[in-house]
């Protein structure tokens, strides 16, 4: 059975690859109720660093347990860690602008944490620096790898993604997903519409006002790499693809988005519609946690978390190398059993 669903085509996953996790924060995640990517709004600023640490070390150093939702559902970093362990992948962390820096080796592209997009997220100089340094990084990675899998960790990232998509003219209102089974659409809409009210007219001005550092860095790495890239994420990665398309239309043909079935099945969002507008194919891993012995993992089947830290893309890679959803679940449960 094929455990990878393809929508609008695909890219080849053959060859030597590296997994890149791009982390950042913005002050949007401090808005109460906008994200569940952390037990409290304040803890959301620790989530990207902790996700990065867990991906590399299988333990968190910046906080004393893995990032969880307010109801205790574990970070999708466990899916990425398990999948990439099965295929023995090279994993690199890029800090695009995280308020809390991870206590592991990472690549810094000279970014800053984003502010509240209702005021402004980044200065033009910071956006330009993130973009230029990320392009250089992509160019260097192209010397060693045939393709990249790029994941993200940024709380409230779907809100900044929606703001970017709308500011670039896409029909994306209410189409981005949420880590919660109850997508806080009214709150997101309110924040985003306030953010895009007085937009600068130029591209750099727009993304500096409403983007998060992660999206700009992912775009830069992909542009510099100039070869095949699997953007490992949900609706946020359609915004990264939209930024790429604005800068260099030709690069789009090298890109596919790799996500989870939980994003595709999410009735509160519409990744298929946005990806068609941008012109990128989507692939989804058909993982199944319904028979897991752990309630924290079974919750994924009920619409909690869904995606993040490259969970979809990394599991697509493991599935493409011949592992089954059951193999991946066994590895995830091994890791999860040490956490509880």
Swiss-Prot record:
Coiled-coil ranges from the UniProt annotation: none
Annotated S-S bridges: none
An example Gene Ontology molecular-function term: nicotinate-nucleotide-dimethylbenzimidazole phosphoribosyltransferase activity
Pfam families: DBI_PRT
SUPFAM superfamilies to which the protein is assigned, alphabetical: Nicotinate mononucleotide:5,6-dimethylbenzimidazole phosphoribosyltransferase (CobT)
InterPro entries named among the record's database cross-references: Nict_dMeBzImd_PRibTrfase, Nict_dMeBzImd_PRibTrfase_arc, Nict_dMeBzImd_PRibTrfase_sf
NCBIfam families on file: nicotinate mononucleotide-dependent phosphoribosyltransferase CobT, PRK04447.1-1, PRK04447.1-5
Similarity annotation: Belongs to the UPF0284 family.
Protein's UniProt name: UPF0284 protein Saci_0020
Organism of provenance: Sulfolobus acidocaldarius (strain ATCC 33909 / DSM 639 / JCM 8929 / NBRC 15157 / NCIMB 11770)
